[in-house]
Amino acid sequence: MGAPNDTVIFLRRGKIERREDAFRIGKSKYSAVRTTGIIIAGGAQITTQAVRLALRNEVPIVYLGGNRILGVTVPFSERYATLRLKQYEIASQPSARLAFARPLIASSILARAAVLEFLANETGITGLEDAADEVRSEAERALNAGSTDALRGYEGRAACRYFRALAEVLPDWAFSGRRTRRPPRDPFNAAISFGYAGVLLPVLLSRTVAAGLEPFLGFLHGPRGRRPGLILDLMEEWRALAVDVPVLRRFLDGSLSREMFRWKGDAVLLRDLDAVSAPVLTVLSRVRGGLLEAVDRRIREVRDGVSRQSPPEPLEFDPEDVGVVWDALEV
């Protein structure tokens, strides 16, 4: 958990109580007007009085059980009924869903290319710039994809090249060069899997629901079971900067060491969840200019696009953006 000025409270142990117009955790106080989200995980608790304070200040609360989202508490409001109707309309039209999915996937590809370009400059490792160019070339194809399957193909090729390039940067024991999940088969995969599902997803969920959007109606990720399709779509743009970069930095500076992982058959498990959640929350809350502010701005752009039935433009990322995140993690 971060310092009292963090905009997101992520609590795994302890209790959140109300103290006047602030949330109190032990001896620390968090101003309700400065708090933009609360995530309750593990054995953490929150009092009814604190929940009421959150509702009055429109602070969404997400409850986690393991990496699974159990529920969300948000203020009762009629403001977004029309917006939801328009979102349902888009979700019912494959061509409209594709139009909204294209810029999100293109953005995610551009973010990965920017990470590789930054690492090329930072490390001097041969081949990273070429890898960045190869990844970036898939963004234009994604923007012009003629079908959902084609879009997934461009994203998949970009992701494969990106992760293969990251293997040149990370220690051999940490990463195999392939993205694996269910189960993750190496420490880097274990760390980013938790960063995506255990930190970034609930943060985005709280902010998306607060913005009035239906989290289960995605564009690329359609409704399926308990999967929040729209949140998975929105995550695509922020995985690289909000999770991959801080996890990379912590592997390279030794803060994430072999001892923090446990091998169990084919799976690798992260022992110290705070070793990943802390740097991810750091870059979300404390990056100069506000990465979390950029996330909120993007959610508003998507919301406005849904309201107008017009998809947003893709986000642009460059190595300087990655450098700001990297520098925020200086030990």
UniProtKB/Swiss-Prot annotation:
It comes from the Archaea. CDD domains: Cas1_I-II-III (cd09634). Homodimer, forms a heterotetramer with a Cas2 homodimer. It comes from Methanopyrus kandleri (strain AV19 / DSM 6324 / JCM 9639 / NBRC 100938). Coiled coil: none annotated. It is an enzyme of class 3 (hydrolase). Mn(2+) binds at residues 155, 221, 236. This is CRISPR-associated endonuclease Cas1.
